[in-house]
Regions:
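Short, well-structured hydrophobic secondary-structure segments
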Residues: 48-83
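Low-complexity or membrane-interfacial segments used for flexible interactions
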Residues: 2-47, 51-54, 92-181
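Helix-adjacent hinge/juxtasegments
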Residues: 73-100
Length: 181
């Protein structure tokens, strides 16, 4: 695998176009869960995001799949054996990330207590993806730039990152320290 993530593959492009820039994630069942149903703007299920702890998640939509991982301070999204996105914390910060996808770099800001994450195009650029969750973290609204081939993967990554780390942030009373995410 080369270190530069590729641009959007065909499976992401058609999914991204059909979603038209937004989707909702809803937790399954009545208990706190780690499995989210992903719904389009008409409320129809188009996939799921299964969280498997803080270090791995699986995104599935039809016959498409991607695995999200966190190891040694680096996040990756891999689909069909190819890295399509990677992210690293900016400096010592636990709430700022640098996301790379398809030759582009995005700056992401995360607030675990507010249950919000935003990925923007560099300094002062517009938003590529915005994830905002409900008070208890069982529902998330996701908005992304439909014309940007990497905005959907960035949105899915941010959804996982916020949902997986939010509960831990509340238990600890503050965001995780360096290397704990």
């Amino acid at each position: 695998m080369n270190s530069a993530p590729r641009t959007a593959s065909l499976w992401r492009y058609d999914l991204q176009q059909s979603l038209k820039g937004s989707f909702t994630a809803r937790a399954h069942g009545l208990r706190l869960t780690t499995k989210f149903a992903l719904l389009n703007s008409e409320g129809k299920n188009f996939g799921q995001l299964q969280l498997r702890g803080l270090s791995i998640a699986e995104f599935e939509s039809g016959d498409r799949a991607a695995v999200l991982t966190h190891t040694e301070g680096r996040y990756r999204m891999v689909a069909e054996g190819e890295e399509i996105l990677n992210a690293t914390p900016k400096g010592q910060s636990v709430d700022k990330l640098e996301i790379s996808c398809g030759g582009r770099t995005y700056e992401a800001r995360v607030s675990f207590f507010r249950n919000v994450a935003v990925a923007s195009y560099g300094r002062g650029g517009g938003r590529a993806a915005h994830v905002s969750g409900g008070l208890v973290g069982r529902s998330y609204q996701v908005i992304f730039a439909p014309e940007d081939g990497c905005a959907l993967p960035a949105a899915i990554f941010l959804l996982w990152h916020v949902a997986a780390n939010r509960r831990r942030a509340y238990r600890m009373g503050r965001p995780m320290g360096r290397g704990a995410m």
